């Protein structure tokens, strides 16, 4: 009897092992490698219990977008280097077609899906040739990078993106995803600015981002409407527009963001460190948002909350008489330490208008916190344990209208010097 059981166990083990398949993506010199992968995916043989491997030592040409089917127990492993087309017009033509899925790499759904890069410093890079786009200030028909959408129980790890054209990772509709040890390098080698190179767009629920490195020209993190239970920690962000909630409420839409923790992050040479942005006329609620243990260096606006957001791409800021605004509740900014960039005449690279899109009426450039709120829309907003200096040696200031919020915000609520209150020191 024992022998029969042992034989059966070995047979079951062998069956399990043999059920897992690996497909190594084929490469043809000078040709688009996407069709070979698409053909393999179309067989259905690699949609479950499979590894899809871009092999180390191979430089793949991803000249057309990749769209994965719904996957179950699949790892996409990028050990080789991947390259977009280096011709702007070629990509624009593809993006302009009705069949373009929205991103160059699209995951359409599934369970237990891993997107894994390489820890080898020379391999596992995805090169989008974004420098040419930035130099040409070309913003028409730009592709997003990676749509990791509708995935339950997912992992994005060890990915390395080099000079992305624009937006990088998005997790719309996904649940229980761990995103860690990824590197995004959207740094211009000329005076051109890498517009809209957002790092991570957190959409979905139960998402953990940690140990990520982002150098870019827009939000390091942006948390969109519908996001719940989001953690972003132990990471480095340089050159961009901060750790952002929103923008929310565009076009009067109803926003819903809850339970976000952002902690242990270094912000360097950024426009913002911690930011909340919602549009005038929006609806809904953002609740229980914490930014904690933030070290900032050469940052223009370390803490910035506005319910009057505006996008310079839409033209001049409109005059709105709307009484609706996205409400905010239980916002905590705790343990912020660093330096404010108040250098006279400094203009951040994304500024293409006069005044700049980020200009705040009455601001001196020395503010550690700006609370741009509407009356009766904000509850329990607290800034505590802040230690900031300006690069010019000037005294640190704040902007806050006491008629818009009745609770103690952790400092004297006025347009003046930063004076912590008891709540800001406890």
Name what the model sees in each region:
Residues 2-426:
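Extracellular/periplasmic carbohydrate-active domains that bind, remodel
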């Amino acid at each position: 009897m024992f022998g029969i059981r042992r034989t059966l166990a070995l047979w079951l083990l062998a069956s399990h092992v043999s059920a897992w398949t690996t497909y190594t993506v084929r490469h043809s010199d000078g040709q688009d490698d996407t069709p070979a992968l698409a053909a393999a995916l179309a067989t259905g043989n690699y949609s479950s219990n499979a590894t899809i491997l871009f092999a180390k030592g191979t430089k793949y040409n991803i000249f057309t977008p990749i769209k994965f089917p719904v996957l179950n127990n699949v790892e996409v492993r990028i050990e080789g280097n991947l390259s977009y087309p280096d011709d702007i017009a070629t990509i624009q033509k593809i993006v302009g077609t009705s069949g373009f899925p929205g991103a160059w790499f699209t995951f359409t759904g599934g369970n237990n899906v891993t997107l894994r890069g390489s820890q080898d410093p020379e391999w596992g890079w995805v090169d989008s040739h974004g420098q040419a786009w930035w130099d040409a200030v070309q913003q028409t028909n730009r592709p997003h990078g990676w749509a990791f959408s509708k995935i339950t129980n997912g992992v994005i790890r060890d990915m390395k993106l080099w000079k992305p054209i624009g937006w990088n990772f998005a997790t719309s509709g996904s649940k229980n995803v761990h995103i860690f040890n990824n590197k995004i390098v959207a740094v211009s080698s000329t005076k051109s600015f890498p517009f809209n190179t957002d790092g991570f767009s957190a959409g979905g629920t139960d998402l953990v981002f940690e140990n990520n490195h982002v150098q870019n020209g827009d939000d390091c993190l942006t948390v969109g409407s519908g996001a719940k239970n989001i953690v972003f920690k132990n990471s480095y962000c340089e050159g961009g527009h901060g750790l952002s909630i929103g923008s929310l409420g565009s076009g009067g839409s109803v926003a819903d963001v809850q339970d976000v923790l952002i902690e242990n992050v270094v912000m360097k040479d950024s426009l913002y460190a911690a930011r909340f942005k919602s549009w005038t006329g929006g609806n809904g609620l953002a609740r229980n948002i914490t930014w904690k243990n933030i070290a900032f260096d050469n940052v223009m606006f370390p803490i910035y909350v506005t319910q009057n957001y505006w996008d310079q791409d839409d033209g001049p800021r409109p005059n709105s008489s709307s009484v609706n605004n996205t409400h905010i509740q239980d916002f905590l900014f705790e343990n912020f330490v660093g330096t404010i960039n108040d250098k006279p005449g400094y203009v951040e690279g994304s500024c293409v208008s006069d005044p700049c899109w980020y200009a705040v009426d009455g601001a001196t450039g020395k503010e550690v916190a700006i609370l741009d709120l509407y009356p009766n829309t904000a509850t329990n907003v607290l800034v505590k344990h802040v230690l900031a200096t300006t690069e010019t040696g000037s005294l640190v200031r704040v902007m806050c209208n006491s008629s818009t919020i009745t609770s103690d915000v952790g400092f004297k609520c006025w347009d003046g010097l930063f004076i912590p209150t008891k709540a800001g020191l406890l």
